[in-house]
């Protein structure tokens, strides 16, 4: 007997639901195989990855500093990623995230992107503000 929710009918297949739970790291991409020595930054979406995003209904990606060379290039890459997702059977957009922790870890150049305070400084406000910044 298949598992079913009594609250909502599933709209997507199990495979689509699993794909939506995946967030892939595309920091580097090498055309020929999975080499541990691959250090070619992925700054534009290769056809192989575009096909995989569409075929497997991937839910999201995480970008790193290697993926972001300029604002224009990052916009183009994001557009390529969303175009690939639009060709999936679910037609859902990707959740695009970036490894931007604040503080010393700043993947986006501070001169072209809004800089946010780090988690440590938010935590330091607990005594005065409690958990109001946690929501």
Region roles according to the model:
Residues 2-45:
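Boundary/entry segment of secreted carbohydrate-active catalytic domains
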Residues 46-50:
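Short, charged beta->alpha transition segments
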Residues 12, 51-52:
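Short, flexible, glycine/charge-rich loop motifs used to bind or transfer phosphoryl groups or to couple energy/partner
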Residues 29-33, 37-42, 52-135:
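Enzymes and membrane/adaptor proteins characterized by extended Gly/Ser/Thr/Asp/Glu-rich
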């Amino acid at each position: 007997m298949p598992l079913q929710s009594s609250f909502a009918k599933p709209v997507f297949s199990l495979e689509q639901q699993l794909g939506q739970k995946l967030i892939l790291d595309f920091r580097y991409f090498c055309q020929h195989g999975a080499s541990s020595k691959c250090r070619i930054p992925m700054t534009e979406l290769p056809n192989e990855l575009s096909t995989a995003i569409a075929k497997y209904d991937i839910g999201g990606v995480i970008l790193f500093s290697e993926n972001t060379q300029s604002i224009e290039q990052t916009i183009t890459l994001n557009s390529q990623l969303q175009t690939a997702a639009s060709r999936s059977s679910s037609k859902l957009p990707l959740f695009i995230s970036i490894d931007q922790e604040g503080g010393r870890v700043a993947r986006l150049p501070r001169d072209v992107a809004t800089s946010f305070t780090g988690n440590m400084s938010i935590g330091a406000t607990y005594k005065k503000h409690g958990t109001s910044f946690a929501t």
